[in-house]
Amino acid sequence: MTIIRKCKQILHSNTVVTEMPMCKRMVIVVLISQLLTLNAYPKQDEISSFVVVSQRDSRYFELSNGSPYIPIGFNLVGPPREEEFDRLFKIMADNRINYCRVWVSHNDWNVEHEKCLQFDPDRAKTIDRFLSLARKNRVRVKMCLEYFRDIRSDRNRWSDNLIYHKANGGPYESMHDYLSSDEGRSHFKAKLDWYANRYGDNPVVFAWELWNEMDAVRVSEWLDWTKEMLPELHSRFPRNLAVQSLGSYDWENKRQRYKTLCLLKDNNVAQVHRYLDEGAGWEICHGPVDVLASQAVRELIAFNPGKPIILTETGAVKPRHMGCSELYAKDQDGILLHDMLFAPFFSGAAGTGHVWWWRQALDEPNLWYHFARFAEAVEGINPPAEHFEPIMISENRYRLYVLKGRKTVLAWCRDSQNDWKSEFVLGHPPEILDSLEIDLSSFLSGSHQTQARVFDPWKNRWQDKSIKSGRITLDVFKRSVVILVE
């Protein structure tokens, strides 16, 4: 058990409060409060450390100083206005968010917005300030370089690039021309040079991402282009991770392309996008969010990529990605978000799921606290040291997502009869579960493990529980709880 977790346990222990003399209680409270305060501020070597793939267990991240790092965050796309920066970073700090993803070529962040290879220093200052605030608030940033899907003379879709087209003074007739020609590839490398000169060797950067969902571009040259450009990223940003992404994994026939990308040597992270989408060709995308998120992670685990897996985009959409789902307006408690955060990590991913639609899913309903609840559940957990084995057990009343480690068993118990359909479509409130017995015997390392702690993320409350004959009985809860055995 970590010092900080133990301190919190003592502070909330009725035994300590009631049995100690008042003077001793006050001294202990002051000392523990000082410890907690010291822990709230990072050491300088942590701030200056880079995110790396752990050498102890390549399925997880750590910092270059050896500290474990679990990316807890979301997609900050479209990018916020500069006047929103201070408010958003305060929210992130208050809710223990340590990661976000941005598109650096989107809207007012796009430095190459008037002419090819002409970079706007004023717009670069917006990115500068964002990264400065990220550093101050201990947030690592994934920098996604491109997202456009076609080069056209006139705008047909939001994702079209106009300035690259010959009709508008650019050098290219088409997307094919840009991706396949020597001129087009040299153009992209020159853009990398500009970013490297300004932002190279920056520990705030979690990773550089070549392109958002590159297999969705108008032509299908993403693989050859990616194979050439990933090493270019590594040469310019040798201390940062380099990654690429594909479109939503919503159809079984995408399995081979996902496997191909996940196994590319120069692609440091096995990323997957997966949404609740009732128009998807894969039926699993129509069902409970914990199930569809977990299955996406397990699909990538089956590829045996030997690198961290992250559900880097997830959310709820109208059928066939025709917009943000109406479900968010009904989700006052954050059921969708909760499952998107917890299910991937407890299925073997290296971090939470990273939600899309941040304004609708997070900001407007003010559901940011769910990140803090996840952070509380995993506080003090060291995934690279534990070498977790993910296990999922499905029973009639619950699904148990277990991470079995060398010294720790961490499990997320999800009510299998509760999901977005039961609450938002059928109108059934979550049932209160009482005296639910869970068999943990197959996950425990010995008879000495007779105590557990249970965290209710809906109430933000820990409770001590006994394990008897390998079984734990859970008291009153709804939807889900986390079980910790150390």
What is each stretch, according to the model?
Residues 46-281, 286, 291-292:
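Active-site mouth of glycoside hydrolases
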Residues 238-240, 264-265, 269, 273-275, ...:
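Catalytic-core region of carbohydrate-active enzymes that cleave or remodel glycosidic bonds
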Residues 9-12, 34:
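Low-complexity, intrinsically disordered or signal/transmembrane-proximal segments
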